[in-house]
């Protein structure tokens, strides 16, 4: 269909769409998405082609700004030059160090216990994990990142506002930043309410007269000066706070929900994990949970890895081509103005890289770990031996890898 192209089938079943196209055309092919030409390169070589592309050849900002700016706000993430985004990530990372995570663990535990005591009764029952994990993640993230002052203002309705923001990421939003439709109105209202809440928190911090080193807000207020000497405005700080919390909340709530759903279908795995936690915290869980304890839970971390492999939060990553771009080892040239697209989620579900790829098998990571600790599993090329740890064990920074749950390259998740 002209203009619409493959938007419907791609939007409904992206991985099946990619596989059908691959069988007909190979790993490199193009399709029309609501008037935009998308050139797809599947597999690790595609990851390397797009994620290691030069800034002069492709632009994440041009690809995403009309989608992300109404959600996050102006002046941050993709509504600014790339060098500013890199600086913003550095500002935020001050509060995302190992030392910070050590401090966050008891806060997260306290929030989870409060949530359980308030919402669950007895020894058994049912819950909607999509709802509970969204709320729980918001409460734990806001408490640890933004402090008690913000956490005390939040209730379940705040999770609904973040859900309204999240619904601003659709193929329709990719083409039209603003339309007179209910989901657009809810997105904009949620952005305004959340932004005003964060601005109020910033003003309260400043009025106190002393900026400490307790949370992300303190870190941003103390460190948000760009290398050219300009300082982020309070509105930009509030917008960056939306982006940081939303990025973590979206990923963590979805992943933890899938984690629990898979546990529900595997009683034996439940028992194994229960015994592993007992081995670390004591038979009656008498020890206080610490950050170091979490690193000892090999099966828990393998289950997280396997959950992310089967359920990557984003099915597509794309860039806008800003200069005619040759595709390596082919005769193809992607013209300026078109888009390049990769799908690490598709690769992680491919039998070419993971035997029995559609099956949930956390113990597959036991075997993978036996090879250089599982760090560079399948990774090739630049940075293959360099690592990053998202909290469930080290993985390679190399982008030519079949396992990229959080993307890679300069736009890799923090």
Swiss-Prot record:
This is Lanosterol 14-alpha demethylase. Its EC number is 1.14.14.154. Its main location: membrane. Keywords: Heme, Iron, Lipid biosynthesis, Lipid metabolism, Membrane, Metal-binding, Monooxygenase, Oxidoreductase, Steroid biosynthesis, Steroid metabolism, Sterol biosynthesis, Sterol metabolism. Its cofactor is heme. It is found in: Membrane. Pathway: Steroid biosynthesis; zymosterol biosynthesis; zymosterol from lanosterol: step 1/6. GO terms for molecular function: heme binding; iron ion binding; sterol 14-demethylase activity. InterPro entries: CYP450_sterol_14alpha_dmase (IPR050529), Cyt_P450 (IPR001128), Cyt_P450_E_grp-IV (IPR002403), Cyt_P450_sf (IPR036396). It comes from the Eukaryota. The gene is CYP51. GO terms for biological process: sterol biosynthetic process. GO terms for cellular component: membrane. It holds the Pfam family p450. It is an enzyme of class 1 (oxidoreductase). It catalyses: a 14alpha-methyl steroid + 3 reduced [NADPH--hemoprotein reductase] + 3 O2 = a Delta(14) steroid + formate + 3 oxidized [NADPH--hemoprotein reductase] + 4 H2O + 4 H(+); a 14alpha-methyl steroid + reduced [NADPH--hemoprotein reductase] + O2 = a 14alpha-hydroxymethyl steroid + oxidized [NADPH--hemoprotein reductase] + H2O + H(+); a 14alpha-hydroxymethyl steroid + reduced [NADPH--hemoprotein reductase] + O2 = a 14alpha-formyl steroid + oxidized [NADPH--hemoprotein reductase] + 2 H2O + H(+); a 14alpha-formyl steroid + reduced [NADPH--hemoprotein reductase] + O2 = a Delta(14) steroid + formate + oxidized [NADPH--hemoprotein reductase] + H2O + 2 H(+). Sterol 14alpha-demethylase that plays a critical role in the third module of ergosterol biosynthesis pathway, being ergosterol the major sterol component in fungal membranes that participates in a variety of functions. The third module or late pathway involves the ergosterol synthesis itself through consecutive reactions that mainly occur in the endoplasmic reticulum (ER) membrane. In filamentous fungi, during the initial step of this module, lanosterol (lanosta-8,24-dien-3beta-ol) can be metabolized to eburicol. Belongs to the cytochrome P450 family.
């Amino acid at each position: 269909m002209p203009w619409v192209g493959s938007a419907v089938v791609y939007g409904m079943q992206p991985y099946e769409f990619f596989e059908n196209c691959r069988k007909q055309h190979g790993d490199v092919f193009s399709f029309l998405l609501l008037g935009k030409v998308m050139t797809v390169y599947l597999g690790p070589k595609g990851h390397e082609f797009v994620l290691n592309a030069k800034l002069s050849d492709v632009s994440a900002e041009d690809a995403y700004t009309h989608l992300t700016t109404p959600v996050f706000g102006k002046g941050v993430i993709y509504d600014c030059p790339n060098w500013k985004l890199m600086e913003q990530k550095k500002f935020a990372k001050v509060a995302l160090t190992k030392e910070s995570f050590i401090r966050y663990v008891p806060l997260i535990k306290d929030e989870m216990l409060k949530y359980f005591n308030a919402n669950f009764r007895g020894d058994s029952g049912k819950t909607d994990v999509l709802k509970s994990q969204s709320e729980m993640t918001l409460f734990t993230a806001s408490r640890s990142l933004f402090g008690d002052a913000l956490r005390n203002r939040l209730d379940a309705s705040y999770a609904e506002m973040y859900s309204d923001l999240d619904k601003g990421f659709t193929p329709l939003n990719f083409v039209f930043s603003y339309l007179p439709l209910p989901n657009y109105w809810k997105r904009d209202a949620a952005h305004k309410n959340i932004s005003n809440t964060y601005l109020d928190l910033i003003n309260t911090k400043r009025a106190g007269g002393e900026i400490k080193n307790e949370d992300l807000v303190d870190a941003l207020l103390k460190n948000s000066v760009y290398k050219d000497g300009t300082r982020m405005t309070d509105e930009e700080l509030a917008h960056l706070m939306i982006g940081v919390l939303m990025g973590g909340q979206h990923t963590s709530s979805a992943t933890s929900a899938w984690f629990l759903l898979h546990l529900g279908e595997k009683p034996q795995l439940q028992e194994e994990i229960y015994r592993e936690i007992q081995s670390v915290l004591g038979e009656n869980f008498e020890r206080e949970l610490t950050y170091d304890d979490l690193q000892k839970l090999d099966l828990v971390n393998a289950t997280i890895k396997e959950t992310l492999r089967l359920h990557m939060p984003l099915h597509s990553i794309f860039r806008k081509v800003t200069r005619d771009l040759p595709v390596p080892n082919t005769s193809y040239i992607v013209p300026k103005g078109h888009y390049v697209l990769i799908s690490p989620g598709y690769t992680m579900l491919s039998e070419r890289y993971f035997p029995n790829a559609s099956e949930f098998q956390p113990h597959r990571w036991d075997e993978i770990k036996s090879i250089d600790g599982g760090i560079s599993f399948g990774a090739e090329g630049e940075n293959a031996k360099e690592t990053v740890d998202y909290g469930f064990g080290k993985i390679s920074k190399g982008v030519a890898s079949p396992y990229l749950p959080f993307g890679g390259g300069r736009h890799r998740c923090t």
